[in-house]
Amino acid sequence: MESIIALFQGMGIMHITLGQVIMIIVSLILLWLAIARRFEPLLLLPIGFGGLLSNIPEAGLAMTALDHLLHYAHTEQLTIIAEKVNSSSLDVHTIKQAIAFAPPSVQNELEVIASDLGYNAGILALFYKVAIGYGVAPLIIFMGVGAMTDFGPLLANPRTLLLGAAAQFGIFTTVLGALGLNWLGIIDFSLPQAAAIGIIGGADGPTAIYLASKLAPELLGAIAVAAYSYMALVPLIQPPIMKALTTEQERKIRMVQLRTVSAREKIVFPIVLLLLVALLLPDAAPLLGMFCFGNLMRASGVVERLNETAQNALINIVTIFLGLSVGAKLVADKFLQPQTLGILLLGIVAFAIGTASGVIMAKIMNAFSKHKINPLIGSAGVSAVPMAARVSNKIGLEADKQNFLLMHAMGPNVAGVISSAIAAGIMLKYISTMI
């Protein structure tokens, strides 16, 4: 009889909390968006499934060895942990707060102690540690994106680099917005958290995940979900802003035919770009370095096997682990916070400002330029490649059925990828000197 009672007590459903129920529903919504609505399915599907796995009661798939120790809360073991973090209380919540403020070296020591006491990390926690904790997955994905990117439109019309840079204005205004919410006492955001949220405005998922893992890992789940959800909604978010900021006549502007870019230019550009940016801003070197390496494999034409692997098999494999790793952060105690609502609101504001900034910059450039730029391509400065460029082309065709803007829009679109990586480097450098 006792064994039957123990069996029932060991059932996950006997331990499920309201927070876990809510997060399971959120995860199911993400799966529905990925499968039924085709919203960024390559990321939202593994993220949603990872969220399901993370919230299964008593499974502990997303828990580290230390999390498991605190969950079972044996008094003698809690005493050891409390001494290490100088906590006079054996209350688990108090100890968790002390651990959160402990230096990384102490946190690592506590993980080792938990492992020595016989606790093991769950599979999703291991995925997270390697894929995101060490920054491996976002960087490999950036390499794959580089292998898929053609710098030709940007090199053929270099001034579109300004449009990509202007679209990053949404990042920095959103940082100020997050700090403003903190100053007003509405939602608490630290400077590193504000910077991690702001990068959502770059519409670049890997960059957002990379920066969040460095500056605000506790917000990574919400930031990743917001970034990829809004990237999927680009065709809905951008058109109203583009139409509101342009006239019918401006949308009909036809741009001059792009020149042919030589193979030599395409080979030299990623090397020069990396050297110029990395020597001035070393913190941008990891992201930009992998991006330029991937692009050099494509442009050189001598490593087709590597190029093919980077932009297909490798990026697909890493995307699976990245999505599951992000899902590991969709646990109730981390996701169901007032900050999550603030992140979702600030994220869409960042997208809107980035879109508007690119369009406005194009209009400003037209005031001083002989060869006019169609302002619609300015919205492609956000680095949702190639979705933002397709939206620019679609709105242009609505105004003039013979006005094809896709290749012109790819210039600022690629520039946006470069600019978001540079913006992330600036954030890392600036904040590392502040804290």
Swiss-Prot record:
It is an enzyme of class 7 (translocase). Keywords: Cell membrane, Ion transport, Membrane, Sodium, Sodium transport, Translocase, Transmembrane, Transmembrane helix, Transport. It is a multi-pass membrane protein. The keyword Transmembrane applies. Its cofactor is Na(+). It catalyses: oxaloacetate + 2 Na(+)(in) + H(+) = pyruvate + 2 Na(+)(out) + CO2. Its main location: membrane. Its EC number is 7.2.4.2. One of its GO terms (cellular component) is plasma membrane. GO terms for molecular function: decarboxylation-driven active transmembrane transporter activity; lyase activity. It is found in: Cell membrane. GO terms for biological process: sodium ion transport. Catalyzes the decarboxylation of oxaloacetate coupled to Na(+) translocation. Belongs to the GcdB/MmdB/OadB family. NCBIfam families: Na_pump_decarbB. PANTHER family: OXALOACETATE DECARBOXYLASE BETA CHAIN 2. Heterotrimer of an alpha, a beta and a gamma subunit. This is Oxaloacetate decarboxylase beta chain. It comes from Haemophilus ducreyi (strain 35000HP / ATCC 700724).
